[in-house]
Amino acid sequence: DEGFNIIDNILDWAKPHKMYVILDLHAAPGGQGRNTDISDYDPDKPSLWESEQNKSKTVALWKKIAERYKDNDWIGGYDLLNEPNWELPGGVDLKDLYVRITNAIREVDDKHIIIIEGNDYANNFTGLTPPWDDNMVYSFHKYWNSTNADDLNWILPMREQHNVPLWMGESGENSNTWYTDAVTLFEANNVGWAWWAMKKIGSVNSPYRIRVNEGYQKILNYWKDGGDKPSEQDAYDAMMKLADNALSENCIYRKGISDALLRQPHTENTIPFKNTHQIPGVVFLSDYDLGKNNHAYYDNDIATYHQSSGSFTAWN
């Protein structure tokens, strides 16, 4: 029950803050995608799609989850598979598994939303329409591509045709300008959105940055370059320090990112980065105003759109 206990603790925290928790299966038995870094796929073992046993385990897992949380009002929904990416012609096998999971969930829980991601990292819904449940949402992800006014035209007709909500369930890994433009696009089309991730280790593009401690860096060096192997105790201490650094109060808060996501999509106004600047005095270059490019600051390289353009642009 260790995994369930973690979810229970999260729900206990979320309830007084009136925050919904969406359960998203990132590592299905065998792995739902070829990307080993996010789906735990092992090329030497059968994937989710190559093993009936793995499929049955996935169905049983979701039924067990639904049995436990069927009456919890702070579960926002069940996101059945995160970013499946496999050769699944016509989406037949993907839909078949989704329907099996949905049926298993509905045996014990007829209340919570079923969230369906497309193939190819949640962006290919071939074979996944029409919806097979009356309480279903289609969820796509968006990374590193353009944010023009017509960039959701590939998926908006699916919502209108089938009268089913859309949710942009994951995005991020870009610049503040891209964040503002993307949120503006979603909200102009009444598409809900969620960002990844709230906290990241050593990141410059998440609201909270987790500091890397010296011991953890030694572990990374050992894994990556074959550096000196840390002792078991040193490794344990480093990981516990990293866990402590991950507490919100110990993170570096990047309020410019929150501002780009929550305020800037709705205004051209700029606001001071700090309210304590005084002249005469020192104003650091990095403390430019919070606001959009060409308003709070001026920059030529403001985002990367390499999924659309085919070439990567370093924005930072």
Feature roles, as predicted:
Residues 45-46, 140, 195, 280, ...:
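Generic secondary-structure boundary/loop-capping signal
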Residues 1-77, 97-104:
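An active-site-proximal structural segment forming one wall of the substrate-binding cleft
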Residues 59-63, 67-200, 205-220:
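Extracellular glycoside hydrolase catalytic/binding regions
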Residues 178-181, 185-278, 302:
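Aromatic-rich peripheral "rim/lid" segments of glycoside hydrolase catalytic domains that contact
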Residues 48-49, 204, 297:
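Short clusters of hydrophobic/aromatic residues that line enzyme substrate/ligand-binding pockets
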Residues 257-316:
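Extracytoplasmic
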